[in-house]
Amino acid sequence: MFENTIAAISTSLQDGAISIIRLSGDQAIEITQKIFDRNIMNAKSHTIHYGFIIDPDKNPVDEVLISIFRAPKTYTREDIVEINCHGGTFITRKILSMVLSAGADLAKPGEFTQRAFYHGRIDLSQAEAVQDMIEASNNTAATMAIHGIKGSVKKLLHPLIDDLMDIIAQIEVNIDYPEYEDVEQLTTNDLLPKTNDWLEKIDHILSRVQTGQMLKKGIDTIIVGKPNVGKSSLLNALLEEDKAIVTDIAGTTRDLVEGQIHIGSVQLNLIDTAGIRESNDKIEQIGIEKSQEKLKDAKLVLLVFDGSKELDEEDKQLLELTKDKMRLIIYNKLDKAEANKDGIWISASNKEIQPLIDALENLYQNDLLKEDPLLSNERQIGLLNLAKEDMLRAKEAMDMMVEPDLIEIDIQAAHDHLKEILGEVHREDLLDTLFSKFCLGK
């Protein structure tokens, strides 16, 4: 399928200890031999060779280690060579240029993984998981990515695909061999229980999609309260840095201030907001409106009150405003008051916030990842929803007693949409777009 040999820098292109230039293709070893001073043409697979990269005049260019991987037990199922050179930007580029001059083509973004997919080493969901691992910004996202690399999506979907194939096969037998006595006549009543069971399974997967996306990207967490209750002090304490301006003047925070923390293996995307109150200050009012907009989209609310004062009407309005949100009620300024109400008591200015950390850890346990695998990829989720829509149309047709051979069209469409998630049914232009989002050298 791929006749050329490709090469690219696989490590970050900046000065460092080591850089890796990767080649893949039938000529990978032969091309490397042209610029290496030791004989590697007959080298065994999965071996490392010390020597020097040399220019056409046999002058040494760099001291390197060459790793040889012979097909098919490689990342791409082609011959692969990895040149480990010193990590300077100049020397890395120079060696790549020599590799290209010796006969390799510069790899396109994601082309190594694309070859792994086309050669059947991984399915499309596993290829996407590779990119998810590269982009992972927290431990949970990395855990989800490694599950995907190990084939969790395929394991999740294959029972659904097999169920559809069973239904399609039953319909096909009735269409092709209606005259055989041992072929039981199929009716929509026979198909309906299997269809309902299938829809229940897919609904269970889709019900956990939002959780998967939150864990992958982080949980949008908004800090809400009246002015001067200590929201900015709390943000600074959580981030362990002075990111937000803190003063005794109410309304100091007029725009959104953001940061990220990790609680256990979960990432919280923190947003400190302007204090929500009635204000005649136009600039402050803009900040308050932004706060209210962010509140609508937030998945978790940290509702902060001044623990040294009784709740007033504005506090009660905030309780009402956030009642339908997942929230933690926090009383700040424990250094100035006694903990006399139910809630989480802290002193943000003194960095005494462990009760809040404990509450957050209890809120997001790792049990979420111990259940079925979670889907978080937008393409995969979209195709899963399309498959569900196909089967809902099929179910509607069954309720109307439509003939099974007509119902098969929607069932086949659902089957194809699930196979598309794994890349077993695909369009070349869409695959090119998908792999183009990968980094060079992967």
Give the location of each predicted region.
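Short glycine-/polar-rich loops that comprise or flank the Walker A/P-loop
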Residues: G16, H46-I48, D297-L300, D324-R327, ...
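Short alpha-helix of the ABC ATPase nucleotide-binding domain corresponding to the H-loop/switch region
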Residues: A250, I276, E284-I288
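Short glycine-/small-residue-rich Rossmann-like dinucleotide-binding loops
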Residues: L239, A274-G275, K299, D306, ...
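Generic enzyme active-site microenvironment
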Residues: L270, V304, I330
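Switch I (G2) and immediately adjacent beta-strands of P-loop GTPase domains
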Residues: Y50-R70, G251-S279, D297-L300
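C-terminal-of-GTPase-core extension/linker across diverse P-loop GTPases
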Residues: F2-I9, L13, D37, F52-I54, ...
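A glycine-rich (often HGG/GG-containing) alpha/beta subdomain
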Residues: M1-T143, H147, G151
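Inter-motif core of Ras-like GTPase G domains
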Residues: E284-S308
